[in-house]
Regions:
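Active-site regions of enzymes building and remodeling cell-envelope glycoconjugates
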Residues: 71-76, 127, 147-152, 264-268, ...
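Short, solvent-exposed loop/turn segments at secondary-structure junctions
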Residues: 35-37, 59-61, 82, 107-110, ...
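Active-site PLP attachment segment
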Residues: 148-199
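PLP-dependent aminotransferase class I/II
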Residues: 22-29, 59, 103, 179-291
Length: 291
């Protein structure tokens, strides 16, 4: 049953979350998507044609494709069942090939990368460390590690902006690798998101088909990897309206709700514990810093 009446929850005011990223002493660059942010970093830090980067064995295409597109030679390091880095295997890789960079990820805010990064920097301090913090976009204060050279997050994975990603870098990045804004992407994404909002109330299947079609079209645009593009003016203005604390709370509560619905209905198989570990992390507030 829908609620009607004069009593409403409070209007949420912005808390300046993205403005406060400047407090970490990094150069801040906003782009339109996470994969293009990774491409921008990949182009900025690639040294030569023989450059080797290590990626986690558990990662999606949008994490590996930017480095393949920019000509990096890719090797993969192992993860343990709790999604932390297998440090013994990592050391073997470091000893067996000349590694120029490594991409890490703090999965769900519970798979700390601090010790592995310390090992990498002790092995050779010039190895570039890139961390994808998309799972911890609103918890950077909790996980921040000064040894990391580039922090990258897909903002649009966490909040309702039409496009958006952010890079926190130690050095100023080369704008020559950046293209111009393409409004078609952000405009069509904004239309799709508006239709999705309408669908949440109407449950109209035609509206659902329309917004899914628009989103699929837009994803095809960024899959082309022609050039990294900046965040749209529309999305950048949206960031000023964000309350990061409320979003982090809502995401965590949603995950708790998911756990309660699953409630023993999902059978875990030995050696395939990713979902099980994820549910454990979310249920332990002190350990998990989603999103």
């Amino acid at each position: 049953m829908r609620e009607f009446g004069s009593e409403h929850s409070t209007i949420t005011l912005p808390d300046g979350y993205f403005e406060n990223l400047n407090n970490f002493g990094r150069k801040i660059t906003y782009l339109r998507s996470g994969r293009e942010a990774l491409l921008y970093v990949a182009c900025n830090c690639k040294l030569d044609e023989r450059g080797v980067i290590l990626l986690p064995s558990y990662c999606c295409w949008s994490m590996s494709a930017p480095f393949a597109k920019s000509g990096w030679n890719i090797s993969y390091y192992k993860l343990k069942e709790d999604l932390t880095i297998d440090e013994e295997y990592l050391i073997k890789l470091l000893n067996n090939c000349k590694v120029d960079a490594i991409l890490t990820m703090n999965f769900f805010g519970s798979a700390s990368t601090d010790n592995a990064i310390r090992l990498v920097k002790e092995f050779w301090s010039n190895i570039i460390v890139i961390e994808d913090f998309s799972h911890c976009t609103f918890s950077i204060k909790k996980i921040f590690n000064p040894a990391i050279d580039y922090y990258v997050s897909s903002i649009r994975k966490s909040i309702g902006v039409c496009d958006g990603a952010v890079v926190l870098s130690k050095e100023v990045m080369n704008p020559a690798y950046m293209g111009k804004e393409i409004k078609d992407f952000s405009d069509r994404r904004a239309i799709a998101q508006k239709m999705k909002s309408q669908y949440t109330y109407t449950k109209d299947q035609d509206i659902k088909k329309s917004f899914l079609s628009e989103i699929k079209f837009c994803e095809g645009l960024i899959d082309e990897f022609d050039l990294p593009r900046p965040i749209s003016v529309k999305a950048r203005n949206m960031l000023h309206l964000v309350n990061g604390g409320n979003i982090a709370f809502a995401r965590r509560e949603n995950m708790k709700h998911l756990i309660s619905l699953l409630g023993g209905k999902v059978k875990m198989l030995p050696g395939l514990l990713l979902l099980g570990r994820f549910l454990q992390w979310v249920s332990a507030d002190s350990r998990c810093c989603l999103p």
